UniProtKB/Swiss-Prot annotation:
Protein name: Metallothionein-3
Modified residues (N-acetylmethionine): M1
Residues reported to bind a divalent metal cation 1: C6, C8, C22, C25
Gene that specifies this protein: MT3
Organism: Bos taurus
Expressing tissues: Brain.
Annotated a divalent metal cation 7 binding sites: C51, C64, C66, C67
Length: 68
């Protein structure tokens, strides 16, 4: 398994540098500066994904972005 990408109990994945925001997720090492769990619909950029915002149609559009 890629040490930079860890599975999340919620079914997504997270990348960690700082302490991970995803409960139950720990990463051995990482070169990423971000850490977040990504929903299934954001799988295309799950490795470098940051999920933010609330819920709802408008929030969903802005929820996922990829780390540079």
């Amino acid at each position: 398994m890629d040490p930079e990408t860890c599975p999340c109990p919620t079914g997504g994945s997270c990348t960690c540098s700082d302490p991970c925001k995803c409960e139950g997720c720990t990463c051995a090492s990482s070169k990423k500066s971000c850490c977040s769990c990504c929903p299934a619909e954001c799988e295309k950029c799950a490795k470098d994904c940051v999920c933010k915002g609330g819920e709802g149609a408008e929030a969903e559009e802005k929820k996922c972005s990829c780390c540079q």
